[in-house]
Amino acid sequence: MRIVFLLLSVLFSIGINASNFLSIKIAQSTLVEETPKITVALPASYKTNITKTYPVLFVLDGVANGDLVNGMIHRLHLSNGSNEHIIVGVTSSNRLRDFAPTVNNDPRGPVGEGGGGEKFLDFLESELIPLINKKFRTNNYNVIAGHSVAGLLVIHSFQSRPNLFQGHLAFSPAVWWGERETLQATKEYVATAKHIQNYLYMDIGNEGGEMRQVYDSLVQTILRHRNIDLHVRFDEFEHETHDFTMAAGLYNALKGLFQHQQKIGV
C-alpha cells in the first residue's frame, strides 16, 4: 500500500509541476548512427551545496521515463530513503537499433532489427559519461536504468562492461531477444566471475510463455551463482502488464540501490 501511495504521489506531482529536465547540447557522435537526445535534471541541493558531488543515474528512454525516476528519487530522498542523484535522460529515435546488442533473425520478433547495442555503450562510455563528468559534480558512481529492450541493454552492459556502471536497473528486460546471446553471456558471467561488486535489479510483470521461462532461467542462474559482493533484488508483478513494470518496480529498485550505496559508502 505504501508503494502505491508513493507512486500516486509522484505521478500527481509530475502532473502539476513542469519537468525539471533541461536539454544539453552535445556534439555529433562519431560512435552511433544518430546522436541521442540528452536531458539532465539536477538535485535540489546542487546549487546551494557547491562542494557536494553526486551519483549519476542514466535513464534510457529519458523523455518517457525521466520524470518518473526523478520524482521517485526526490520523494525517497525526502524520507531518507535515497541519495540525491543527477538524472540523465538518454533518448534514442530508434530503440531497437540502438539498444538491442544483436540483430534478431527469429521470425517471432522484428527480423533484421537491432545490432547497435555495443556502439551505444561505446557512446555512453567514451562520449556521454566524460561529458557529464566534465559539466557536473559527479562522484564516479553511475547507474543505468531501462525497460524492455532498453532493459536488455542494461543486462548486456552488466556482463560485457561490468565496471562501466555500478548499478543496473532492468525492468522486464527483453532477454528473449534474438538467439538469446545476452542471456547466455550473462549466465556465463555470473557463473564464472570471481568478484562482482555491483547492484542489479530486475523485475517482470504478467508476461507468460517463453518470455517468462527465459527470464526465470536467468534469475535462477544468478541466485545460484552470485557472489557476496553482488547485491541483487528481483520482483514479480503478476497483476501488471509489461508496459507498467517500470512504474511498479521503481520504488523497490531505488530502495535496493540505496542499501547498496550505503554498504559501500556512497
Q: Residues of each region from the PLM?
A:
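Bacterial N-terminal signal peptides
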Residues: F5-S13
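Sec/Tat signal peptide C-region and signal peptidase I cleavage site
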Residues: I14-A18
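Non-catalytic cap/lid and distal C-terminal segments of serine-dependent acyl enzymes
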Residues: S19-V266
